[in-house]
Amino acid sequence: MIIALDTYLVLNSVIAGYQFLKDSYQFYDSGALLLTAVSLLLSYHVCAFLFNQYKQVWTYTGLGELIVLLKGITLSAAVTGVIQYAVYHTMFFRLLTACWVLQLLSIGGTRILSRVLNESIRKKRCASSRALIIGAGSGGTLMVRQLLSKDEPDIIPVAFIDDDQTKHKLEIMGLPVIGGKESIMPAVQKLKINYIIIAIPSLRTHELQVLYKECVRTGVSIKIMPHFDEMLLGTRTAGQIRDVKAEDLLGRKPVTLDTSEISNRIKGKTVLVTGAGGSIGSEICRQISAFQPKEIILLGHGENSIHSIYTELNGRFGKHIVFHTEIADVQDRDKMFTLMKKYEPHVVYHAAAHKHVPLMEHNPEEAVKNNIIGTKNVAEAADMSGTETFVLISSDKAVNPANVMGATKRFAEMIIMNLGKVSRTKFVAVRFGNVLGSRGSVIPIFKKQIEKGGPVTVTHPAMTRYFMTIPEASRLVIQAGALAKGRQIFVLDMGEPVKIVDLAKNLIHLSGYTTEQVPIEFTGIRPGEKMYEELLNKNEVHAEQIFPKIHIGKAVDGDWPVLMRFIEDFHELPEADLRARLFAAINTSEEMTAASVH
């Protein structure tokens, strides 16, 4: 493109120079004009390549680039003069001078115009991407540094807001600190702000809620920087800002990992993750990849989801980690044993499961096959292959279960606790509440309802649930694997349960609406649902806190013969009897545990 443009401008300078001089200047013949044009063109391009003119970025043209251009044009004119003298024993100085001036003006002008247009576009872009940064501490300065390090930053930080009065009226990173949060609204109006970026990674949830409400009043777009844990693990950088989500306003303090202990358990090891294409399984894979395992086996029965997570992880970590994909069903016992024998994983995270309460109420046999039989297959195969640590992803619905899904999870816990008695593998279970943002969870459902204009459906105004984010749940699972000693149930101190109706209201407000514009409708409790969930029952309560925010519950082994008898018989049971026998099996086990305690 540039070469073609320069060719046109060089030839045009010869023609224009001739037209300017023809009435007062006589050439020997038309061949002299042709010789001048060809000589100037060829010598100019040779000089341009010698001086690397075509490797320069002309949108950043400066004095240095113009001097190089001047050298090339002057040298090509000199070469042309020598050729003219060799052929005609004279040089056409007036024509050469005219061509030199016209080339310099036209070619140099296009370079300068390119820069002027680029600067104009950048100024327009900057005018629509001016950001006010909340937080002038280490997080805010780190984020500003990364934003400004880009050649063409998408967002231009223009000022800081910070409640620390000692920083007011100072300049940090060249940006003024103009006041505390009471200055947010005036700053947005005065500085023509388009974005507010909350850059305090350690901000407590209540403080974030208050700050967010203040920012919402301005009417501009609100962003937030990643949490320090995400930056520490390398999953996000300070400059990768994002929209504020319902999870941020949930009231949960993220779990801080013991990265050294996790690294000791995972670095250089072979890790297998079942359900690797699911919400939790895929996030576990992302986070353990930061600890440099030797290889990760991505196991799942959905080819599209497995291909998606493989493509993502191999692109990010493929230079240092070998990723294997295995399309398989955990209900296929022979396949599980074959894969365990093939890879001999050091650590297994068993995330494959059916989790939707209403669906499992209507399909109890499928819940048993996947959550119970599947867990037994994977756990026994891991035991056979000499796996060091086996982590079962369980649920708070396994506590005093009132539905089929919870009962099958409770059953699965009992299976691994019994295996842990006789195996060298450390079997542990991790229990947590509902996961925000996972497929089929309330957040995606509420979002779709809001997009349609409502109503947002909530079962009961008093219904509460414990909630975790997907990254937080995955961190707990990984940390549990690092802490595992065997036959343990890890439970996160999840703080206070959250009212579902409050979560719905927050999401409506985050979407820019009021509850008058998008109403909330109460539909009644569904089959198998409880008004509230528990994390431990009375037989499991244990005083020990093994890690900040992580408690240990006492292992419940259950009555192994009763459990195995159910597994042997369930295929022949009608649906009503299956549900009754399932609950009878786990309740008998609970009674035995309670009796042994007393």
Swiss-Prot record:
Compartment(s)? Cell membrane
Q: What biological function has been recorded for the protein in this entry?
A: Involved in biofilm formation.
InterPro entries for the chain: NAD(P)-bd_dom_sf (IPR036291), Polysac_CapD-like (IPR003869), Polysaccharide_Synthase-Rel (IPR051203), SAM-dependent_MTases_sf (IPR029063)
Which PANTHER family does this entry report, sorted A to Z?
POLYSACCHARIDE BIOSYNTHESIS PROTEIN EPSC-RELATED, UDP-N-ACETYLGLUCOSAMINE 4,6-DEHYDRATASE
Q: Which family does it belong to?
A: Belongs to the polysaccharide synthase family.
User: Keyword Transmembrane helix on this protein?
Assistant: yes
Q: What is this protein called?
A: Probable polysaccharide biosynthesis protein EpsC
Tree of life domain: Bacteria
Q: Which GO terms describe its cellular component?
A: plasma membrane
Gene3D superfamilies referenced in this protein's UniProt entry, alphabetically: NAD(P)-binding Rossmann-like Domain
Topology of this chain in the membrane: Multi-pass membrane protein
Q: Where are the transmembrane segments?
A: 1-21, 31-51, 63-83, 87-107
For biological process, the GO terms are: polysaccharide biosynthetic process; positive regulation of single-species biofilm formation
What single Pfam family name could you report for this chain, choosing any that match?
A: Polysacc_synt_2
Q: Which organism is it from?
A: Bacillus subtilis (strain 168)
